[in-house]
Amino acid sequence: MDELVSKVMDEVMKKIGASAPAEECCAPAAPQCNLTEFVGTAIGHTIGLVIANLDHQVHDALKIDPKYRAIGIISDRTGAGPQIFAADEAVKATNTECLIVECPRDTEGGGGHGCLIVFGAEDVSDARRAVEVALRETPVHFGDVYGNSAGHLEFQYTARASHVLNKVWAAPLGKAMGIISCAPAGIGILAADAAVKAANVEVLSVATPGNGGTSYSNEVNTFFYGDSGAVKQALIAAREVGLQALKTLEPSEELKSSTTPYII
């Protein structure tokens, strides 16, 4: 009987193998990690971690408020805007505070940044939940990130800025906010100009490679706020010109969303 079952299974597997390529019939392996601190991963080589009781020496060195015994961490190689906007959603949804946001020069050889975000919480369950929300929201905010071998374009939107966006870019709390980030940097100026001409928005700041607003990345990043409709209109205008300009540098390469566009 066992021999018969084995033969049947062999035939079934042969048929599956013949009818579907390996990439279609084999799902990607979920990340395996036995560390209790590990929460998960997301697009952009993003890792989520939680530490229930941070060592007091590390706590002091990071200048974290003593009341926050637990911390949540989002760290990635590619992307700052997606993870920061995702962190803003995480703070809205949990009893946590964003303690640290830093953007190292990275993108794994590209023109932009990576990101380090640290949440503080009095209860480890809140820290873990914040990391979970941020990991869930990160792919959403990669929806309007486009790239080719010559550079990248990033557009982010929220209808209601919260404490993370206020901390990082001085976004007015509760206001709609958008950001434009483009590499090479000149395309960022072109996109910013198109955005502000297209809609009635207020510019918070413009970060260039040398004015301290970026980690010497080959980008110009523009941050602005206004009514929800105006912010979206500005972003759509910037996206239209940005895509056309970046395409000229590598005409043979397709410029498409990293996930699914969400600014519509």
Positions of PLM-derived features:
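A structural signal for small-residue-enriched, beta-sheet-centric alpha/beta enzyme cores
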Residues: 2-17, 25-79, 102-114, 121-122, ...
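N-terminal low-complexity, intrinsically disordered segments
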Residues: 83-91
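A glycine- and small-aliphatic-rich helix-loop capping segment at beta-alpha/alpha-beta transitions
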Residues: 92-93, 123
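Conserved, well-folded catalytic cores of nucleic-acid-processing
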Residues: 93, 137-140, 198
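Long, hydrophobic/aromatic-enriched structural stretches that serve as scaffold segments
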Residues: 93-101
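Short amphipathic alpha-helices in soluble, non-transmembrane regions
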Residues: 128-137, 234-241
